[in-house]
Amino acid sequence: MIGILGRLDYTPSGKEAYIIYKSLFDMVHSYDMEVIGIIPNSIKKIKDIIDMCDGIILSGGSNESSYDNEIIKYIYDNNIPCLGICMGMQEMCMLYGGVMKDINNHHSDLKYAHEVVTKDSMIYGNRIIKVNSRHDSAIIKTDLDIVGKSLDGVIEMVEDKHKKFFVGVQWHPENLYMVSSDAKVLIDKFISSLK
């Protein structure tokens, strides 16, 4: 079972709601895995839910909860496989020495927005991969291993090589895994790391 962290968002009428994107459900279900949504309400209950999971996805979004840092630290300290996507990667980095800045050239509705050069990545080795991009801020420093950057120098992928699977990507593989072998490799590695 894979836990996906729900993100605070707003309905068209302005009411608060926790959401989990259907594309993430579809991606996990395509691997014959079940999904459990993790909605921040009590850190004790969240840890109990995380302990039931084989791995965790920290999804993208634009609003973090007050529990996010505790959740990520718990995942890290207990060596639970974790894939951070977009904001999820940013939160991973910020907890471990990260510095972030606003940018304005990495938001595109294109399937492939730019290339990322990977270096010593346990997923990709040393190569160039094509990714999508939908972020308005970027990590410029982190204590995690920086293993992928876009051609303009934006950090696009981080790992902790001492963990079973603690990987963050700035792009959205859940929108590419059906059409991109680069995205599929990442998801395959995450699934194969599950306890």
For every predicted segment, state its role.
Residues 127-129:
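Catalytic cores of DNA base-excision repair glycosylases
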